[in-house]
Swiss-Prot record:
Subcellular location: Cytoplasmic vesicle, COPII-coated vesicle membrane; Endoplasmic reticulum membrane
Self-association state and partner proteins as the record states: The COPII coat is composed of at least 5 proteins: the SEC23/24 complex, the SEC13/31 complex, and the protein SAR1. SEC13 and SEC31 make a 2:2 tetramer that forms the edge element of the COPII outer coat. The tetramer self-assembles in multiple copies to form the complete polyhedral cage. Interacts (via WD 8) with SEC13.
GO molecular function terms attached to this record: structural molecule activity
Organism: Kluyveromyces lactis (strain ATCC 8585 / CBS 2359 / DSM 70799 / NBRC 1267 / NRRL Y-1140 / WM37)
Superkingdom of origin organism: Eukaryota
Compositionally skewed regions (Pro residues) per UniProt: 779-791
Function: Component of the coat protein complex II (COPII) which promotes the formation of transport vesicles from the endoplasmic reticulum (ER). The coat has two main functions, the physical deformation of the endoplasmic reticulum membrane into vesicles and the selection of cargo molecules.
Coiled coil: none
Name under which the protein is recorded: Protein transport protein SEC31
Keyword set, alphabetical order: Cytoplasmic vesicle, Endoplasmic reticulum, ER-Golgi transport, Membrane, Protein transport, Repeat, Transport, WD repeat
WD repeats: 6-46, 60-99, 102-142, 152-192, 201-244, 249-289, 292-332, 379-399
Example GO biological process: endoplasmic reticulum organization
GO cellular component: COPII vesicle coat; endoplasmic reticulum exit site; endoplasmic reticulum membrane
Amino acid sequence: MVKLAEYPRTATFSWSHDRVPVLATGPASGAIDADFSSTSTLELWSLLSFDGSKPSGSVVADGKFNDLDWSGDDKIIAGALENGVVEFFDPKALKSVAKIHKHQGPVKTLKFNAKQNNVLVSGGTQGEIFVWDSNKIGSSDYSPFSAGISNTPIDEVSSLSWNQSLAHVFASASSSGYASVWDLKAKKQVLHLNHSSSTTGIKVPLTVVDWHPTSSTIIATASSSDTEPLVLTWDLRNAHVPLKVLSQGHSKGVLSLDWCKQDENLLLSSGRDNTSVLWNPQEGSILTQFAPRGNWVFKSKFAPEAPDLFASASFDSKIVVQTLQNLSNTLDAQANESKQHASEDEFWNNVTSNSVDDKPNTVKIQAPKWYGNKSPAAQWAFGGKLVRISDDGKGVSVVKPCISGLEKNQLFDESLKSKDFVKLINKRLSQKINATNEDDWNLLENLSMDGTALYLKDALSLDDAKEDIIKKSEEDGADFFNQLNDKFVPEGAFKLDFSESMKPLTNFLIKGDLKSALNQALEKDLLLEALVIAITSNDALLADKAKNAYFSKHSEQSGLARTLFSVAQRDVEDIVTNIDVSQWKDAVQFIFNYTKEDISKKNSLLVKLGDRLLHEGNRKDAILLYLSGQSLESIASIWLKEFPELENQLTSQKDTLYEAHLECLTEFVERFTVLSDYLDKGTVKLTNQTLISKFLEFVNVTAANGDFELSLRFLETLPDDNEEVKSEKQRVLIASGKTSTTRSTERTANSTLQSRQGRYGSTSVPTANGAPRLSNSGIPPPNPLAAPHQPPASTAPNVVPRKPSFVPQTTSAIPTPNPYAPAAVNQQIPLSVVGSRPSYTPPVNPYAQTATSIPPNPYAPLPVAAPVPLGSPVAPPPISGASGYSGQTPHLHDKPIDGWNDLPSVSKEKPTRAKAVNTAPIGMSTPSYGTPDLAAVPLSRASTNSTLPPPPPNVRRTPKLTSPPEVASPPLPLKKTNSYAPTVSAVQSSQMPQQISNPLMPPASPNPATNGRSFVPPVNPYSPAPSAVTPTGIVPPKALVAAIPSPVPAPKAAAVPPPRKMNRKSTAVGDASAASNLLSSIQTKPTPPIHSPAMVDPVAVQYDQSAVSPTNVEIAAEQGAGITESDRPIVEFLTAELQRVTPLIPQEYTKQLKDCDKRIKILIKHLEHHDLLTQPTIDKLHQIVAFWKEGNYSEAMTIHQDLSANHSSEAGNWLTGIKRLMNIAEATSSQ
């Protein structure tokens, strides 16, 4: 027996019919409450409640209860009251629906029909038995009817029970000692039972009755006599003799019986001997005698749909809910043994402190019937699937039911893929748990709108008033020094000071003994003179001595001296550790100004200052400092500590504890994921074990629901050396079917590679730097995990420029041709090598090394590409999304590359596209020291049906003025720089020679000497324009070319006459310079390593104004040409409110008002462009404005909450601005 709950009530009760049942209680008639209250209240208790002392709901009743019963459909609770009233309650609405006074005396018992939920029978003190229809109780003239005529005397009806098979038959027991069977069809008593003691011959009063759960002819009765406390079972087909007589269980009268509806072998009884007994009525044996209570146990009942549980009510002021199963262990035996061996002194010393913890006495172990009848017809499977046998038993179906609370988190999944968390943030803001949780999501909203660096710069900057003071002092100081002469020139006569106190100092100065002069000045407490002497001496030791003397004297009383000490030491540790926390922003300025060179030290000091703020209770500002200090772990530790509190608050909003826990867990993971993406682009690797356990739990729930893709995405962020992570990842991979597929592909690729090596004799030898070396045939080994080449579906080339992501390895030696290899054919050139179609035929370098090509099909024979003779007609290479195979896995950038497809910012005239010119692939090589030679790859006439992947999104976060992303404008053409040169298109211009990205090596850093500007060579107006097309041969990286001069100059490209029918336009020489600058400005820059994001100083960094997107433009108050006349009142009212409250708010709320202004402008822009906002949303804005004008802020806020909850996809950043402005307007409405 395990006690699950205990409710401090002396009350009768009834169970609901839920799988997780609810208990209804009503104060027992005749019982006196602890507070001597006469009020009677029906109370509902949830077994899942944290606080067992408070009911989940209550409703005042008309009197105290003798009995309670819950209808089978859980819609009605009926109460038998001591004042003769039968009262009906609605448990969901928590109200009384009817009170009917039909009985002449107290109503003693009542019972709902097992077959018809609306039929009820009640019994009273004067032998009254009435049958009720709960569907008609709302009628004012309704009256129940009598059960019929009794053949035996009935005094007080004490027990009623319906037949479980026949809806018109019920049984009753009364104080007269008879148990009667009634038939409502005949409207009379049809049978009666009585029993006389076999020892005394005295009639045994049968006061309790209950029907068999499945048989319509078997019934159980019990005696309330203390001399004959019997439980008897009867078969009505032989009603003269009981089937079984259950004795030796109770020592006093039995007051309650309950036959388990799920197992006819279990019968529960309780009585005046303070105990409850579990019987096997079929065998007539005792199974368990439960621990005695402090008073009579007048009612014990199984939970109808959870028979493992039963409740018992006693006059000891407790209702106890417990389980049938007795968890036996050796601790009880050990405790009893230790008590028996205790000395007499130990016994008497502990007798008052020993708690009474009686255990149930299990006589016979018997498993309930429902444990042995586990149906194989349906079983749960991993991934939230339900496997079910079909109705005919010949098939199996697998379904995935949608369970409330376990739905797929579609919004979170989409946000992770698109890296756009605005909709997720809006959803969480509309479903905030508490004020602290709302602050966190407001922070994330600001990061999404402004970007991390810009938001922190604004949040950590000094107040506007203090900034004005600093600026004014700087101006005054500049004016003061401008008025001073450049050099002090002494004038006029003077005398040396040989006074008694100054004579030694003057003598030391005359002699030039500055050390002694300094000591003398310090003895006389002449700190100013000592500092001048120390400066004059140019002696570091003397200067330190003078400064230490100053700090020793003034640091305790002067804050300025402590500040000067930190400045002198170039160390702000003292500032961070000891400054008053109210001046934390000034400490932040110290940290940024004096730790510019040491990023790690700056971050550690910011975290340390954040710890001090958190200790003082300033959670919001502490999180700002942790964010600035790049400390996700510190923020996570705060959120983990707050997790139980949020979970407790969610319990009142959810039906179960599990749903509350799951919702809190999901919200926590979403919040942390959004923050980590904004802080370090989602590349964080978790190390906090508590945080890892939370993510593992979320992964487990997500995978169990079948969302394996989301589970794997989060598993990648967890450490691989964690055993639980390894196990979970393997489980998810197997369940998603990815492990078997990968292994099969690997085995197939390996076997193909081995057979190819055996046939052609090619082997792979590792190089010194770890990169794969080409085989003997001059061809790199294929990637065994690469997808097989698909045959071409079209021959039409799709010219799309793309930055190379990887470059195939080449050999530095001339390969030996394979005599058994088939003739070489032109293969498709990898897209990473050639960015666009060449428009000229470069000359052949006869001394260049022959390049090898990479075949697109790893299973085809490997040809060797030979140089193509000059002038050979070769078709232009078709450019498509898929390139040939390389000997290594392509390096995929997790982060977008800045400048991947940047567009020129100046609109140019659209050029005329030149016709393609036949070119021949030429093997070219540019030697460089210390690097392997890079050769060209021959072209191919074949094409492929694969397409280019979409360009990576831009990671640069800039302030936005609109919620939805805007589509970039189309590429703008460039001006022609030479009237005799072919026109250079914008597409070609973006394909300047790029740095070659090697997946096995970190990307090269950009040349600092050329960062941000480009060299513009002199332009010859009569020379051919430089082509922006990457030559067929591989060009070495810019950094290597700039650093290492090539001993052999690269051959010059021959000029090609312009194509026919080309439009020409004369330009000035200056235009060529401008175009050259423009070409340099749009070249892409190498991306830093993915796992080492650059640390951005949020305050000291200088922001590039050119990086701000076109949408981040200040909107003037009078702007609104695109706003319709119907929407203009919204704009005018909000603008007027902003102007009204601006002079009324305190100085410390200036930033909040600026934020409101920025958000309101976002709304205005949406209204101007007629995007994002639908008409229902605009209508609600009109309603908000109308209530706002009337001063009805509560109604306006209600509509605001409706917008936030039901229109979250449209309610972007602007909705928060309306809420804040409304709060400010309400606070200043009386001013």
